[in-house]
Amino acid sequence: MDKQEAKHINMPSPSACEHKSVEAYLFIDPLCKDCWEIEPFIIKLWLEYGKYFSIRHIVTGKVDGTNASSHKWNKPANIRFVWEKTTSLQGFSCDGKVHMQEASSTPYLVSMAIKAAELQGRKAGSKFLRKLQEYIFLENVSNPDCELLLACAKDSNIDVEEFKKDLYSASAKKAFQCDLKFTNEMHITEIPSLVFFHANSDEEGIKIAGTYSYDVYVQLLKELVKCEIEPEPLPPLEVLLEATQFISSKEVAFIYDCSKQEIERELKKLQLKRKVQMIDVKCERYWKWIAKEKDLV
């Protein structure tokens, strides 16, 4: 792993082809384990190619069970091709006890909570979502209640009082309804799904359903940008840990393309410096940053 002196992750200066910026939309159900497992792919893609695209999380699901019959899927407009495949290639979690009966749809309150957090900004929403997924998949919380959602808000360092106000607000409800409408328009039938569009073009977008190898996402991004793009150097390990706050050895090894053993040697050095705390959860090892949090960008 290359060592760099930079202390922050800064976006590089614009290149000649950046006027063809790309918008990416990640369609998720926060109770779906596959939607959690795709996060390392998104983090790595953002770190290496983030200057070429923006990304938004779109919460899929139904408002309640009574509306299931009226939730129809329309044919997608302006989508060139669809890759339909659902498979987990990397295996970031080995716990098979996630409550799949609840994972098939997103409870209304959880969806509203994510939208409420996003009202404080996309970064706030992403932090809240990751913290929520940690509770769900590492502690097998199958039915998150209001108390747990407030704990997630506190742990993700967003404004808890503002979050309380927004949780049942018309703004959060409207944001969730917009996500549902967009899900319909894009004909999302599998999650996670990632849709890429040119930001300033009427050209068709690209949709990929399921989880693929990292190279597939890079190739699709290059196809949309339509010029040679080079990955930015990955940040120092400490910067990544500080930004994510809580991450597994396997995720870090994937992001840096190193062996798990090599990564854990570096992580244990940081543990000796009291910068991280090692936490073993079931059959996976996680690392919690115990210094002050900084943002990715």
Curated annotation (Swiss-Prot):
Classification via InterPro entries: Adapter_SpxH, Thioredoxin-like_sf
Keyword Nucleotidyltransferase: no
Major subcellular site: cytoplasm
GO cellular component, one term: cytoplasm
Protein keywords: Cytoplasm
Annotated signal peptide: none
Record localization: Cytoplasm
Stored SUPFAM superfamilies: Thioredoxin-like (SSF52833)
Complexes and interactors: Interacts with Spx.
Family per record: Belongs to the SpxH family.
Function field: Adapter protein required for efficient degradation of Spx by ClpXP under non-stress conditions. Interaction with Spx stabilizes Spx and exposes the C-terminus of Spx for recognition and proteolysis by ClpXP.
HAMAP family assigned to the protein according to its UniProt record, in alphabetical order: Adapter_SpxH
Name of the molecule in the record: ClpXP adapter protein SpxH
Organism: Bacillus cereus (strain ATCC 10987 / NRS 248)
